[in-house]
């Protein structure tokens, strides 16, 4: 038996799927690969083979990002150039929550951004001797 998991995607409740798709495209470089509904009710946006699912919910009071519950991120992405990605996102107008900083306890250089619905995404690179 050799079943293989192929992909995974966090599922974010959002107020306005069209606005969120535009944000993920313009600010974070995630392209919409699938959408459904008129007006948009659901979308999948991806970058480098990694996806995020966006689903319209109403009322917006049901959107409670992890940060508001005492957590940190809704999703975390390991990357190969955290400083380059931070520069890209900053130039595109991303709201930086923290970083880039070094997390000695788990050996990562990381930063986080907040999307237009308050969801926080972390991006990190494993530390090496050269980092």
How would you name each of these model-derived features?
Residues 14-19:
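Short acidic-aromatic low-complexity motifs
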């Amino acid at each position: 038996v050799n079943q293989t998991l192929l992909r995974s995607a966090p599922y974010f409740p959002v107020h306005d799927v069209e606005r969120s798709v535009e944000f993920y495209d313009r600010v974070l470089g995630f392209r919409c690969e699938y959408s459904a509904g008129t007006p948009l009710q659901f979308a999948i946006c991806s970058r480098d083979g990694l996806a995020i699912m966006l689903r319209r919910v109403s009322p917006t009071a049901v959107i409670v990002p992890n940060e508001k519950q005492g957590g940190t991120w809704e999703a975390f992405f390991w990357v190969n150039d955290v400083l380059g990605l931070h520069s890209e996102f900053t130039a595109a107008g991303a709201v930086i929550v923290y970083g880039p900083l070094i997390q000695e306890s788990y050996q990562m250089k990381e930063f986080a951004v907040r999307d237009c619905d308050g969801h926080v995404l972390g991006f990190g690179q494993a530390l090496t001797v050269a980092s």
